[in-house]
Amino acid sequence: MSKKYEGPSMMEELWEYVKMIVFVVVIVFIINNVLLINARIPSESMEKTIMTGDRVFGNRLAYMTKDPERFDIVIFKFPDDESQLFIKRVIGLPGETVTIKDGKVYINDSEEPLDDSFVAETPVGDFGPYKVPEGSYFMLGDNRNHSRDSRYWINSFVEKDKILGKAVLRYFPSPKLIK
């Protein structure tokens, strides 16, 4: 007489579920702490590019082998309180001098202002000059008249090692690549 197959025991099946849950938790941990950073936009400082309440993913590996470039949108630790994450656009690069005249941004005494076609409304005001230290960056929001950015911080510059990632995708409320 042959013995009837009964399948795995309840404990064996439970153990398989536990292993699967642990595997998923480890994968999510790796994705969230090594590959991606998840951020919510708390203010209007980046509007019209990214709106208040949007959720974005940043690529944590973007600056492992290269430096941030002008106009990259980055997620970083706020220099005046590193417990807060900010998202802004890179404007001034290491070693440059940034001056803002009548709301227009000039780099190193250039006669031509930077392209600001992404700015929400015509910016106002004069600021600077700001001499960006080596290894640091000068940040501005796209909604310049409503942005708390490098112009107003006690520590005006963001060190490269405080940049956590390059914003690449808005995933809520609807998916959109960030440029």
Regions found by a protein language model. Give the residues of each.
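Soluble "head" domains of membrane/secretory-pathway proteins
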Residues: S2-W15, I30, V34-R40, K48-K179
